[in-house]
Regions:
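Metal-dependent catalytic cores of enzymes that make or break cyclic nucleotides
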Residues: 28, 35-227
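Amphipathic alpha-helical coiled-coil "transmission" helices that mediate dimerization
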Residues: 2-39, 43, 50
């Protein structure tokens, strides 16, 4: 009787192991499909504005490095990575001539630019991510004092992931070439963060960003074209 029970237990154990392996394989396939989808979206944006796609990749990298420095969980960091890769997807609806305009933007131009987080939210809100990607993305231009856009939300009402993305976005943008100016450099980017410390940007996030740049040696990598 005990021999039969042992065999049944062994069989059950083998079945559980098999299920675990099948589940792991399925999860890897799902992850691979999601990554492929994200890359496809990035390529779509890149065909409209090559700067945006390169910018998103670099912001994602810096934001993840900041999040790791802050001790966030692997799950949160993965969400920040995905949000960073997609945060400017809403610019797909902004005319190319505005995105690449070398001169001063008009009020109409600025209105279209300021609308891109809401466009991104509408694109992403029904995608079944493991993280609140649409909310993170729509908030990445919000500022602690309410002076940001598109909704002017304040303080801790802004998701931590979005506050991290905001800092990474500013640092990368100021450190890179833009259609209307050459790169200002990472030192000037950090100075801009210091001017907005606690009013525009989260102080804890700034400290972590300064640490990864000044102590960890993180650099914003540019391609030969400045993209």
């Amino acid at each position: 009787m005990s021999h039969i029970s042992l065999s049944a237990a062994e069989e059950a154990g083998t079945y559980v192991i098999q299920l675990e392996r099948e589940l792991e394989t399925t999860l890897k396939k799902v992850q691979k499909s999601m990554e492929a989808g994200i890359q496809a979206i990035c390529q779509t944006v890149e065909t409209k504005d090559p700067y945006v796609a390169g910018h998103q990749k670099r912001v994602s990298q810096l934001a993840c490095t900041i999040a790791k420095e802050m001790g966030l969980s692997t799950w949160q960091i993965d969400g920040i990575r995905v949000a960073g890769m997609l945060h400017d997807i809403g610019k797909i609806t902004v005319p190319t001539e505005i995105l690449s305009k070398p001169g001063r933007l008009s009020h109409v131009d600025l209105a279209m630019i300021h609308d891109h987080p809401k466009v991104a939210f509408d694109i992403l809100k029904n995608v079944d991510f493991d993280w609140p990607i649409a909310r993170i993305v729509v908030q990445h231009h919000e500022r602690l004092d309410g002076s940001g856009y598109p909704y002017g939300i304040t303080g801790k009402d802004i998701l931590l992931e979005a506050r991290i993305l905001a800092v990474a976005d500013v640092v990368e943008a100021m450190s890179s070439n833009r259609p209307y100016r050459p790169a200002l450099g990472i030192e000037e980017a950090l100075a801009e963060l210091a001017r907005g410390d606690g009013t525009l940007f989260d102080s804890e996030v700034i400290r972590a960003c300064e640490k990864v740049v000044n102590q960890r040696g993180f650099k914003v990598e540019l391609s030969s074209s400045g993209v």
